[in-house]
Amino acid sequence: MGSSSATANRFLLSKIATSEGHGENSPYFDGWKAYDRNPFHPTKNPEGVIQMGLAENQLSFDSIEDWIKKNPKASICTPEGVEEFKNVAIFQDYHGFPEFRKAVAMFMSKARGGRVTFDPNRVVMSGGATGANELVMFCLADPGDAFLVPSPYYPAFFRDLGWRTGVQIVPVDCDSSNNFKITKEALEAAYEKAQKNNINVKGLIITNPSNPLGTTLDRNTLESLVEFINQKNIHLVCDEIYAATVFSSPTFTCISEVIQNMNCNPNLIHIVYSLSKDMGLPGLRVGIVYSYNDDVVNIGRKMSSFGLVSSQTQHMLPSMLLDEEFVARFLETSPKRLAKRHGVFTKGLEEVGINCLKSNAGLFCWMDLRRLLEDQTFDGEMVLWRVIVNEVGPNVSPGSSFKCVEPGWFRVCFANMDDETLEVALKRIRTFVRQGKKAQDQVVQVKSPKRWKSNLRLSFSSSSTRRFDQESVNVLSPHMMSPHSPLVRAKT
């Protein structure tokens, strides 16, 4: 189809559907495309791109698989469980199975150390955290309204919060001077800027633990956020989908703990949760909205009709999540494995002088490559990113995709691969840095087809910059979608 025909066809479609609201043209998704075209495999494609742009927890699958084998009756797809097939297959109310909501509420409590309890009647289902975030926006805001979001923040918030709802994002700028902590001054500045631009701010959304920082918010910060939204009479949405990934001190403090001892309006407090990160089950599409506002619960249930959790999943998970022995073991083992993997990765980077922001949670590191930039700008960051993806081989995500205010930061995921693949990725990165130091400001011609043995460089002359810009056109064009698009497979 020619470009003129494609343009004409767009006029036949809705503005929402044909807008750029999905964000697929960002470097965040370009890295996915590079991986999708040339995925790493230890024997079939050892020179391929290693996926380090996917925040997925694959370190505890064995625990879940072992439970499934020991509990065949939990699934309707086994001889032991097939007798429940009809009850699961027929029409289900959008409120969700009572046992499912009870199990989710119990797990949410245990994932937060049992310090708070959750009412199953306030659990609203959705298709993953993506659907849950959008559902909250539909409940709380009108098209054109805005939410404050501290940066750096999850790149797909642009899609999740605003593509179909028409809600705007107003970044709250945070920087490395205080390890990207959220300050009252930054909140006030963002709020006042929105007011001057006649933007109606309906709320503040935070991720705790943070994606991409891998840090947790302390009680004092959370209390200041609650005070801020109460003063402004706006909503606070807390995305807590990484609650059970905390692997070292300080411990996780959830918003529910904080408001127990505060004089605040609970109608303004809402939580988004999911089993995608804590349990590594993004394919099951379990998203949850937990609101202290009765109207949001009631309206959210109606809206959840457009993205329910499958009945089969609702049937299986209660048996697992209400198994106290399994849950206790899982919540003890999973963080230990994350801590070990985090330690291996960060120490491996430190061998060549690369540091990450100190973190205690999540499935990723916030890697500091500022000293490797020839040009301390976001253009310089993109030059370095293209070299890393195209020449070195891991798909990492540039900080600019997360609206970071400082160039040179990258999110690197470490929990979505086996130990051997992680070692290959580390070897490639370390070799790149070491050979770049030797090359200094010289542009060294790549001699070996093996990426981690190539003479790669860290400094880029204008000619080499143009060369990689050209490569980005040829290799990372947003219009070159492969049949198995990562945009289809992307996890929340």
UniProtKB/Swiss-Prot annotation:
The gene is ACS1. Pathway: Alkene biosynthesis; ethylene biosynthesis via S-adenosyl-L-methionine; ethylene from S-adenosyl-L-methionine: step 1/2. This is 1-aminocyclopropane-1-carboxylate synthase 1. Catalyzes the formation of 1-aminocyclopropane-1-carboxylate, a direct precursor of ethylene in higher plants. Belongs to the class-I pyridoxal-phosphate-dependent aminotransferase family. It catalyses: S-adenosyl-L-methionine = 1-aminocyclopropane-1-carboxylate + S-methyl-5'-thioadenosine + H(+). It comes from Prunus mume (Japanese apricot). Its cofactor is pyridoxal 5'-phosphate. The modification N6-(pyridoxal phosphate)lysine is found at residue 277. Gene3D superfamilies: Aspartate Aminotransferase, domain 1, Type I PLP-dependent aspartate aminotransferase-like (Major domain). InterPro entries: Aminotransferase_I/II_large, Ethylene_sulfur-biosynth, NHTrfase_class1_PyrdxlP-BS, PyrdxlP-dep_Trfase, PyrdxlP-dep_Trfase_major, PyrdxlP-dep_Trfase_small. PANTHER family: 1-AMINOCYCLOPROPANE-1-CARBOXYLATE SYNTHASE-LIKE PROTEIN 1, BIFUNCTIONAL ASPARTATE AMINOTRANSFERASE AND GLUTAMATE/ASPARTATE-PREPHENATE AMINOTRANSFERASE-RELATED.
